[in-house]
A protein has these predicted regions:
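Extended, highly charged segments
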Residues: 1-311
Length: 311
């Protein structure tokens, strides 16, 4: 498994994980927090079916929210783990909130289901700006994974005791099934750039992985489009635009309906929409299989690094 193939968790895969987790752990009772390394936090929840563990990571190239198998008990003594343990003690996880096309998840905690939230754990999946923060009932930061000082960001400094400031709003357009084909095409061809850049610059929620899926996804009805992310928009034929828009609409329908299935591909990446589910899942949930995907890739990366250091 090549370390270079690790796929970043994008908006689409985050939505898939949240759909899966809501069915499993909402509501559930918080029990345990531990920090196995400097870039992730593991949380244990008691459900009607037993314990479920989540991993929240703010690692720049592998920021993620996934389910994991029961982990080794390690890292409960870190400052962040102790702050989260104290802040969430005797509370229930009552909601997993994610707004629009933002890669920000709000885990809401209350004394019991049906009561107002009194603590919020925020996970921001934003590349090198990723972070995790615990907020009190006044939305003040009581614990933070990565302090952001004034000299690091004049726009959005983040420290314990500060009011929580959400990330700046996304500047591009939110994709919509209601947008007419002609307008969609016109926006993407307004500037003579490659297709990948046109999609990312014009619409929210677009990742390199999604771009590849939109243009090369195996379909039951059509051969894969002979396009790449580097294809100039002015060289795309009318028929290709129609096929691409069909894929675009399929993707948006999956987001709207919350229908996702996980397929791991031979190149080391994965997809969560518009493809048959793997037959090798052994009944494991989508969020758990993604947790294993990231664990395996990151373990492989560590082994490769260690072997190179020994040479």
């Amino acid at each position: 498994m090549a370390n270079s193939t690790l796929q970043v968790m994008d908006l689409t895969s985050l939505r898939a994980v949240l759909v899966d987790l809501r069915a499993q752990i909402i509501p559930s009772r918080f029990e345990k927090a531990q920090q196995p390394n400097q870039q992730s936090l593991q949380l244990g929840f008691r459900t009607l079916k037993g314990m479920a563990w989540l991993e929240l990571s703010w690692q720049a190239d592998a920021a993620r929210l996934v389910q994991i198998p029961p982990p080794s008990r390690i890292g409960s003594g870190s400052t962040l783990a102790q702050q989260v343990q104290h802040g969430l003690r005797q509370l229930a996880l009552v909601e997993l909130e994610q707004r629009d096309f933002e890669r920000v998840v709000l885990l809401h905690f209350a004394p019991r289901p049906g009561e107002p939230s009194v603590r919020t754990l925020v996970l921001e999946l934003m590349g090198r700006h990723s972070n995790a923060l615990l907020l009190d009932d006044q939305k003040r930061i009581t614990a933070i994974a990565r302090q952001v000082r004034q000299h690091q960001s004049r726009v959005r400094p983040l420290s314990s005791g500060d009011p929580y400031i959400p990330p700046p709003s996304l500047q591009s357009l939110p994709p919509s099934c209601e947008e007419p084909f002609a307008q969609w095409k016109r926006r993407l061809t307004l500037v003579p750039v490659d297709l990948g850049k046109a999609l990312r610059d014009t619409y929210q929620g677009i990742s390199p992985a999604l771009t590849k899926q939109l243009i090369s996804f195996p379909s039951r009805d059509e051969a894969p489009l002979p396009l790449s992310a580097s294809t100039p928009v002015e060289e795309i034929s009318d028929n290709q635009w129609l096929l691409l828009h069909g894929r675009w609409t399929q993707w948006l329908n999956h987001l709207r309906c919350g229908e996702f299935i996980l397929h791991l591909d031979e190149a080391g990446g994965y997809r969560v929409w518009n493809d048959p589910a793997d037959l090798t899942s052994n009944g494991e949930s989508l969020s758990l299989r993604l947790g294993l995907y990231y664990r395996n890739h990151l373990n492989q990366r560590q082994l490769l690094k260690a072997s190179l250091e020994l040479q």
